[in-house]
């Protein structure tokens, strides 16, 4: 037991005037007053720790909640029809047919990944995997959305190296394929990298588990790793000023605020959980992530039909002398908390022993509506659990469109010099594909295992990852994640919809049907009215877009305070779209050359839209103007036609157009198929606009010559604009833009793939 004096409920009642460090714990005066009002006394040290972490921005969504409600307001019953679990659960769950369900979610681990890039990224992966486990599913794949400072900035190499190794090291050790993502470099992320991790899992519909504690007398079992001092960063006053000393030593002060992960413990924990689920030994379950036991106990109790009592000293600890507040606040990784009926406890413990997973009975569900926690026989917590988990402060922060927004929008690309000659067009292409903005991410993705477990059908560099779910029927899922901070800075409403449109389109080009959305909303300080305007507009854009497309937001995450001083990151709403494909054998690949002599057809309208584009960034260091127009009805039409084409075998390859426009799409598709092609520019077209415009709602498809008439006829009948844009010449080893220039595949590959190894290799 700690030598630290125990601040009990009795002591707190008897000493109402004791000064407490609530401000150091991040609580405001009115929040502290509200806690005292709820309890009818001052909180104990342990209670103060619980409320401070659970009422933090990260856990309570106190600045975003009023805006996030809009997702619910715009989601119809029809949109919810296939959703088995949604916002408020550990992760969203969608019925994908044939008795299968998929759960998926995106979470951020941004700030820890700057402080300690390897562990920050690794534990970000571990945390989202446990969210998926807690729903009753087997995790099957991960993805990542990464944002770093300028590629040539001094500190970027440190952060990139650690984050990429952390994502790969943890995911690879778990045996989970990393099937895609995005990596963006921009100076706004210097000091504030974004590490957003997605995990997806599968289960039979009847195996869904939720986080709740019900049934008086049911036992609370903590299982997994021991509880240590790592991750008590948010509760800084509970730990020390230094990182020195052994965790178990008497002179220890504080370990780093960043959690330390052990993927091998988590891998065993996954198998243990799945066996517990299969044996029907779990009533309710919650993973221990942010806020640790404070979160797990209060959320389980709040969601149940009674109260809960915890004997905190029973928690297995790996550090001596821990206080009750430290045990409650620890964010040690690889831990789960389950509710188990008394008659099943022995069987539960036996399964854990089989997998060599430490499991301890730490309490039970009680009658009543209180969460009580004792520490060596003395009560240190006695609270209504809903007040901790769900009834924290809710702020309607000031929302104000920044005065600088008008000037930003007015600063268009109209006056920027454009390439005109064939040589200038070729030089522009080579410069753009070599830029950190568009170059190959192969140096990153090769550090990830993309095909472990044998169910990966498509992965990076495809537009979306495709995973087989059912080996007998071939049923699978497609997942894509997208975001554009540049477009969102120009117009947050449109920027969020452009991210949604691209992720939706990336799923559709594989031949899958988009079904559901998750998100991770990364913004600056909520105390800045301009940031809150960006956030409000992005939420509304995303929600309205999902309503138009008829797919629900199943859950997500908000990350605020991503800024250095007064400089915020580019507003970055990350959107993940889940699609379902009936048979992964009919998925549409990215690479050209599958069929000899394919015709290249460009679907959609190409307009002179360069504001916010990668061309304006790479060639001119420019950001301003109005983003490309979003047409979500067109996106739905594209998806419908690609689905029909996939089922009928009308297209042999497809690749969406986004950053870098047609030129980037052609280069990527040609290199993926190791096949050259000729691009035939329309007679009346501006070569620069045709090659580099970033107009939305476009897809490049390769069509076998025998199916061209049938495919184009289908597009014409559905009023989808199309133009024959080129041919794939059998045996070609170059990309030729007819009448302009030609570049060999060898030069394209060297240029495209050489940048990141030169910077970070």
From Swiss-Prot:
Substrate binds at residues 108-111, 130, 259, 331-333, 559. Pathway: Purine metabolism; IMP biosynthesis via de novo pathway; 5-amino-1-(5-phospho-D-ribosyl)imidazole from N(2)-formyl-N(1)-(5-phospho-D-ribosyl)glycinamide: step 1/2. GO terms for biological process: 'de novo' IMP biosynthetic process. InterPro entries: PRibForGlyAmidine_synth_PurL (IPR010074), PurL_linker (IPR041609), PurM-like_C_dom (IPR010918), PurM-like_C_sf (IPR036676), PurM-like_N (IPR016188), PurM-like_N_sf (IPR036921). Mg(2+) 2 binds at residues 131, 287. The keyword rRNA-binding does not apply. CDD domains: PurL_repeat1, PurL_repeat2. It catalyses: N(2)-formyl-N(1)-(5-phospho-beta-D-ribosyl)glycinamide + L-glutamine + ATP + H2O = 2-formamido-N(1)-(5-O-phospho-beta-D-ribosyl)acetamidine + L-glutamate + ADP + phosphate + H(+). Monomer. Part of the FGAM synthase complex composed of 1 PurL, 1 PurQ and 2 PurS subunits. This is Phosphoribosylformylglycinamidine synthase subunit PurL. It comes from Rhodococcus opacus (strain B4). The gene is purL.
């Amino acid at each position: 037991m700690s030598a630290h004096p125990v601040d009990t409920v009795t002591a707190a009642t008897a000493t109402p005037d004791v000064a407490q460090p609530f401000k150091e714990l991040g609580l405001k005066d009115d929040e502290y007053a509200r806690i005292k009002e709820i309890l009818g006394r001052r909180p104990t040290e342990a209670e103060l720790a619980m409320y401070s972490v659970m009422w933090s921005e990260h856990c309570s969504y106190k600045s975003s909640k009023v805006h996030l409600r809009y997702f619910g307001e715009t989601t119809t019953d029809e949109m919810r029809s296939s959703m088995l679990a949604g916002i408020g659960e550990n992760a969203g769950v969608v019925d994908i047919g044939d008795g299968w369900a998929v759960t998926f979610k995106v979470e951020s681990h941004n700030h820890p990944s700057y402080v300690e890039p390897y562990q920050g990224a690794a534990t970000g992966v571990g945390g989202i995997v446990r969210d998926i486990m807690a729903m009753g599913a087997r995790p099957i794949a991960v993805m990542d959305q990464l944002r770093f400072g300028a590629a040539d900035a001094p500190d970027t190499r440190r952060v990139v190296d650690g984050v990429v190794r952390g994502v790969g090291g943890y995911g690879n050790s778990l045996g989970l394929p990393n099937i895609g993502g995005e990596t963006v470099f921009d100076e706004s992320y210097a000091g504030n990298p974004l590490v957003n991790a997605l995990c997806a899992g599968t289960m039979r519909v009847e195996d869904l588990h939720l986080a709740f504690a019900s049934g008086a007398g049911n036992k609370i079992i903590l299982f997994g790793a021991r509880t240590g001092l790592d991750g008590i960063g948010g509760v800084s006053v509970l730990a020390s000023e230094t990182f020195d000393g052994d965790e178990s030593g008497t002179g220890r002060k504080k370990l780093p605020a960043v959690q330390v992960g052990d993927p091998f413990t988590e891998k065993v924990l996954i198998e243990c959980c799945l066996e517990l689920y299969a044996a029907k030994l779990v009533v309710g379950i919650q993973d221990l992530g942010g806020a640790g036991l404070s979160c797990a106990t209060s959320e389980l109790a709040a969601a149940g039909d009674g109260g809960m009592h915890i004997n905190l000293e029973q928690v297995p600890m790996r550090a001596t002398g821990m206080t009750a507040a430290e045990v409650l606040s620890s964010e040690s990784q690889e831990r789960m908390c389950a509710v188990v009926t008394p008659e099943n406890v022995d069987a539960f413990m036996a399964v854990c022993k089989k997998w060599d997973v430490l499991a301890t009975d730490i309490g039970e569900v009680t009658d009543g509506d209180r969460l009580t926690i004792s520490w060596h026989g003395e009560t240190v917590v006695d609270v209504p659990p809903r007040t901790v988990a769900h009834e924290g402060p809710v702020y309607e922060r000031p929302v104000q469109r920044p005065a600088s927004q008008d000037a930003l929008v007015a600063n268009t690309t109209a006056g920027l010099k454009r390439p005109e000659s064939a040589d200038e067009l070729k030089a522009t292409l080579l410069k753009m594909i070599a830029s950190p903005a568009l170059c190959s991410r192969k140096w990153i993705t090769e550090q990830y295992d993309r095909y472990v477990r044998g169910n990966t059908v498509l992965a990076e560099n495809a537009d979306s990852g495709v995973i087989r779910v059912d080996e007998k029927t071939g049923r699978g899922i497609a997942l894509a994640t997208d975001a554009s901070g540049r477009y969102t800075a120009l117009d947050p409403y449109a920027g969020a919809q452009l991210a949604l449109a691209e992720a939706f389109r990336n799923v559709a080009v594989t031949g899958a049907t988009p079904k559901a959305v998750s998100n991770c909303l990364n913004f600056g300080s909520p105390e800045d009215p301009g940031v809150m305007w960006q956030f409000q507009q992005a939420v509304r854009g995303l929600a309205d877009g999902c309503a138009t497309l008829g797919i629900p937001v199943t859950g997500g995450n908000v990350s605020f305070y991503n800024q250095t001083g007064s400089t915020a990151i580019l507003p970055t709403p990350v959107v993940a779209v889940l699609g379902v494909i009936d048979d992964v054998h009919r998925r549409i690949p990215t690479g050209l050359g599958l069929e000899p002599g394919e015709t290249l057809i460009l679907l959609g309208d190409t307009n002179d839209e360069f504001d916010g584009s990668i061309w304006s960034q790479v060639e001119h260091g420019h950001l301003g103007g109005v983003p490309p127009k979003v047409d979500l009805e067109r996106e739905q039409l594209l998806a419908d036609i690609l689905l029909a084409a996939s089922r009928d075998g009308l297209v042999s390859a497809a690749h969406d157009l986004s950053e870098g426009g047609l030129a980037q799409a052609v280069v990527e598709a040609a290199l993926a198929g190791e096949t050259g092609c000729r691009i035939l520019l329309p007679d009346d077209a501006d070569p620069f606009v045709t090659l580099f415009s970033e107009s939305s709602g476009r897809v490049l498809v390769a069509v076998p010559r025998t199916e061209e008439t049938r495919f184009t006829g289908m597009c014409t009948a559905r009023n989808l604009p199309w133009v024959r844009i080129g041919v794939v010449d059998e045996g070609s080893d170059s990309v030729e833009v007819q009448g302009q220039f030609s570049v060999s595949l060898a030069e394209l590959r060297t240029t495209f793939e050489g940048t990141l190894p030169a910077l970070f290799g």
